[in-house]
Amino acid sequence: MSYRRPKGTYDVYPGDAARQEPHERPDLWDRLYDAARDLFRRYGYAEVRTPVFEEAELFVRSTGETSDIVRKEMFVFRDKAGRELALRPEGTAGVVRAYVEHGLYKLAQPVKMWYFGPMFRHERQQKGRYRQHTQIGAEVLGSGDPLVDVEVVALLYAIHRSAGVREEVIHLNNLGDVETRRRYVPELRAFLERHRSELDPDSVARIETNPLRTFDSKDPNTRAVLREAPLIGEYLSEEAAAHLRAVEEGLEALGIPYVRDERLVRGLDYYTSTVFEAKSPVLGAQDTVGAGGRYNRLVEELGGPDVPGIGFGTGVERVLLAARAAEPESALDAFFVTLSPEARLPALQLAEALRAEGLSCELDYAGRSPKGQFRQADRSGASYAVVLGEEELSGGFCTLRDMKSGEERRVSGGPKGLLRAIAG
């Protein structure tokens, strides 16, 4: 009997890079993880690790009883003691729970944390979205400064850039403060009531519970109705408007492309004030690569003090899918092609010398013919093939083939000469 992976999941494995999806390639995972970890270090963030399952009530309290996560997507189970637990559908709630449980609010504020790990949502499988997906995220707790918002957006943008995502634009909105919502929500609710018969069932249910979330509807009829709805930007309090201006000025100062999107609300109930999405047109209609926002009441909601927070999450699968549209970096710097048995040991010595200088190299250990070795060099995604045979050994050089152009040239000077030719 044979077994297959569960629906909505995938494997990461060494294979034919040209045939694999980006998220199936361990080399791309490693590159993204290393780049993100280095950026977090440079921005002053410390790693936090929380369990992959928590009390289910934690996610109900944080994301909201009416959120799609709670109503449709959580993997919920009971342990032997009868406690209701859930596989984590997102990262923020667990990090905030840890912040409160361990008294991190007693430390010098803000506390800046990052995480990397699997999340679980029982949702319809589609390109770049899975029931188990891996998220890179960051949370900053203990500061309401708008420049913190700018830093968080800049960090997300930098991670995506380091992975090769291009043409990215930040969509930005502000969901206001208590004063803003006191003025805006009744107006929006009255508008929705007038169009109740034209809305999808989920949006009708949200009229009372959280009318702002109707802007998150994917139903075409509802979206058509909402094009005429009042927008929150017209109702922002002076304080909320000033916060938004400061964030915009910060993004402009850093040269980060953004647009105001007054219909952007995000899909979780805990968001307040700043919300944002990083979008890239290379993904088509489902163009969001990462997103986040402020949750200034969540810490208190989960039993802690009145402490503001902001964060983001970005799916590894979405990032790698978006990055594929850019010119990908080669997975391998050099593949050594040996034309005779006598060339194998010198090839190994050269490869080891290049590895010591930081280059990635491979040799043939499967006894392939020279033609088969060239095919393997092509499949591996190597930038160059380094050819060694009797002529090269007797002449004290190697033949370097550019795998993209097919151009060949002789390279002498031993390991140093080869390093200069490959690395520049």
Curated annotation (Swiss-Prot):
UniProt subcellular location: Cytoplasm
Protein name (database record): Histidine--tRNA ligase
Record-annotated disulphide pairs: none
Provenance organism: Rubrobacter xylanophilus (strain DSM 9941 / JCM 11954 / NBRC 16129 / PRD-1)
UniProt KW keywords: Aminoacyl-tRNA synthetase, ATP-binding, Cytoplasm, Ligase, Nucleotide-binding, Protein biosynthesis
Pfam families to which the protein is assigned, alphabetical: HGTP_anticodon, tRNA-synt_His
EC number: 6.1.1.21
Annotated catalysed reactions: tRNA(His) + L-histidine + ATP = L-histidyl-tRNA(His) + AMP + diphosphate + H(+)
Gene that this sequence comes from: hisS
